[in-house]
């Protein structure tokens, strides 16, 4: 049971506060080479109707045959969501007519899904975390795609996507803000990507969401919900929720009532608009698919898949915090994408002393590397600075061979030119000066040349930073910062 909604999450209306209630149905394309009930390819981007079997086209007499890998992927996903795996599930026909659905029905799971209740722990930037309950996860076929811009007088149908396996992941109505909804979908996407069960590519339609939104006065019964169909980006999910909540509040405060309906989100205008009245389950006339036997497996099948699961984001985050003293925020950034976590762990594996420098390595991965990658628009897989090179830079800092300032210069050289960081340090004379006598001479020169600053620093010790900066500048950034600090404190009597 989630805690009451914080006042800051309520929406102010003309008649007082309103609470948003949100549930999401996320459609995640299963990562598999072939479709749910046929051997046709799931490859993205082929010519129209290039990946269509007789089953996908619903030719008479063609029977569906279940793809075992899709079943395994659904079970893996359920385990990753801490959900109940149902050892017996069934397939049903969801009946409706649309040109991109050649069978005249969609094979789905209505009465007995493969995965039951679970939960996802969601962190939000402002600390407004939430546990989102999972109602169910079921397997179903995707539909084809209508193309309206290929011919001026007709719409064309591409069935490449028809029959591709989807996991529909249905949340409970536990979400109370657009930020929570975005964080939930982000976390769900991350989990599926870690598991390798969905690539999460929203631009290609691999992950899309139907967003159910209603509003109510705090503590009142649930309001009438509207469903916003096929929202295909996390940013749009937030925008759609904010607009729809305001729209419903406006209607209710004007004395109107909310019609239960299906709406779409117009990204260009940032608003939702009506598509059709919202269907109920009976509108689809669900009944068991007579061509498919119940899907049954034993607990040993589930246990074998569970034993092969990778470490998931929450467990990895906890380990990074415990083993390397990372902050929750830094650990969260590192585990937010599987590739970034793998990069960091590979850097750790190449460090001379990961226990000593694990936190330093995290700082460099997050602040220097990620910052530069984002600025340049480069994916981490294509990083000009390799894990071995970054580990070498961190080692050089950790063993006091170079200072932090010099390390940033070295990082820039490696980014632009490549090469072995250690060899670069030696070739370019970048080693930090640790000779106390040499540093002391520089300190004495600067202290003697600035008697007014000495008096100010003695009155206000924080001004020692000015002297540190001058010494580092004079030494070309090569002086050992700790030695500089110690000498200055002694010279200034601090």
UniProtKB/Swiss-Prot annotation:
The function of this protein is: Allows the formation of correctly charged Asn-tRNA(Asn) or Gln-tRNA(Gln) through the transamidation of misacylated Asp-tRNA(Asn) or Glu-tRNA(Gln) in organisms which lack either or both of asparaginyl-tRNA or glutaminyl-tRNA synthetases. The reaction takes place in the presence of glutamine and ATP through an activated phospho-Asp-tRNA(Asn) or phospho-Glu-tRNA(Gln).
Matching NCBIfam families, A to Z? gatB, PRK05477.1-2, PRK05477.1-4, PRK05477.1-5
Q: Name the catalysed reactions.
A: L-glutamyl-tRNA(Gln) + L-glutamine + ATP + H2O = L-glutaminyl-tRNA(Gln) + L-glutamate + ADP + phosphate + H(+); L-aspartyl-tRNA(Asn) + L-glutamine + ATP + H2O = L-asparaginyl-tRNA(Asn) + L-glutamate + ADP + phosphate + 2 H(+)
Annotated protein name in UniProt: Aspartyl/glutamyl-tRNA(Asn/Gln) amidotransferase subunit B
| SUPFAM superfamilies linked to this entry | GatB/YqeY motif (SSF89095), Glutamine synthetase/guanido kinase (SSF55931)
In terms of PROSITE patterns, this protein maps to: GATB
For biological process, the GO terms are:
glutaminyl-tRNAGln biosynthesis via transamidation; translation
Enzyme Commission number, as recorded: 6.3.5.-
Gene that this sequence comes from: gatB
Q: Which Gene3D superfamilies match?
A: 1.10.10.410, GatB domain, N-terminal subdomain
Subunit (UniProt): Heterotrimer of A, B and C subunits.
Pfam annotation, one family: GatB_N
Gene Ontology MF: a single term:
ATP binding
Q: Which organism is it from?
A: Rhodopseudomonas palustris (strain BisB18)
State the family it belongs to.
Belongs to the GatB/GatE family. GatB subfamily.
Top-level EC class: ligase
Keyword entries, A-Z: ATP-binding, Ligase, Nucleotide-binding, Protein biosynthesis
């Amino acid at each position: 049971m989630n805690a009451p909604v914080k006042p800051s999450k309520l929406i102010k209306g003309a008649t007082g506060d309103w609470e948003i209630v949100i549930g999401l149905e996320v459609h995640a394309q299963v990562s598999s080479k072939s479709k749910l009930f046929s051997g046709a390819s799931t490859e993205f981007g082929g010519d129209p109707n290039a990946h269509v079997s007789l089953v996908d086209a619903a030719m008479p007499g063609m029977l569906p045959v279940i793809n075992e890998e899709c079943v395994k992927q659904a079970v893996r996903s359920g385990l990753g969501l801490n959900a109940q795996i149902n050892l017996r599930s069934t397939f049903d026909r969801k009946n409706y007519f649309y040109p991109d659905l050649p069978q005249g029905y969609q094979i789905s799971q209505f009465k007995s899904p493969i995965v039951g209740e679970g939960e996802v722990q969601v962190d939000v930037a402002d600390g407004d975390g939430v546990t989102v309950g999972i109602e169910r996860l079921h397997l179903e076929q995707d539909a084809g795609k209508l193309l309206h811009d290929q011919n001026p007088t007709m719409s064309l149908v591409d069935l490449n996507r028809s029959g591709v396996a989807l996991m529909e992941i249905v949340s409970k109505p536990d979400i109370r803000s657009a930020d929570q909804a975005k964080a939930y979908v982000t976390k769900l996407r991350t989990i599926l990507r870690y598991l390798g069960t969905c690539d999460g590519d929203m631009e290609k339609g691999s992950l899309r969401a139907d967003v159910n939104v209603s509003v109510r006065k705090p503590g009142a019964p649930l309001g009438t919900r509207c469903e916003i169909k096929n929202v295909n980006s996390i940013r749009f999910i937030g925008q759609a929720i904010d607009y729809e909540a305001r729209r419903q509040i406006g209607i209710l405060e004007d004395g109107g009532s909310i019609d239960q309906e299906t709406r779409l989100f117009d990204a260009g205008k940032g608003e939702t608009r009506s598509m059709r009245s919202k269907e109920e389950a009976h509108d689809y006339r669900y009944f068991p698919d007579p061509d498919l036997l119940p899907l049954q497996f034993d607990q040993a099948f589930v246990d074998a898949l569970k034993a092969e699961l990778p470490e998931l984001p929450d467990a990895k985050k906890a380990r990074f915090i415990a083993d390397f003293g990372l902050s929750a925020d830094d650990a969260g950034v590192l585990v937010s994408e599987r590739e970034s976590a793998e990069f960091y762990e590979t850097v750790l594996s190449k460090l001379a002393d990961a226990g000593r420098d694990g936190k330093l390595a995290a700082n460099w991965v997050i602040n220097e590397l990620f910052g530069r990658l984002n600025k340049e628009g480069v994916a981490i897989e294509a990083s000009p600075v390799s894990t071995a090179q970054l580990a070498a830079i961190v080692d050089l800092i950790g063993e006091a061979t170079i200072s932090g300032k010099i390390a940033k210069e070295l990082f820039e050289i490696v980014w632009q030119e490549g090469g072995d960081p250690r060899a670069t340090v030696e070739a370019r004379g970048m080693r930090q000066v640790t000779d106390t006598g040499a540093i002391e001479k520089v300190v004495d020169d600067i202290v003697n040349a600035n008697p007014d600053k000495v008096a100010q620093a003695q009155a206000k010790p924080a001004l020692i930073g000015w002297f540190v900066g001058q010494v580092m500048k004079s030494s070309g950034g090569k002086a050992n910062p700790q030695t500089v600090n110690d000498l200055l404190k002694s010279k200034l009597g601090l």
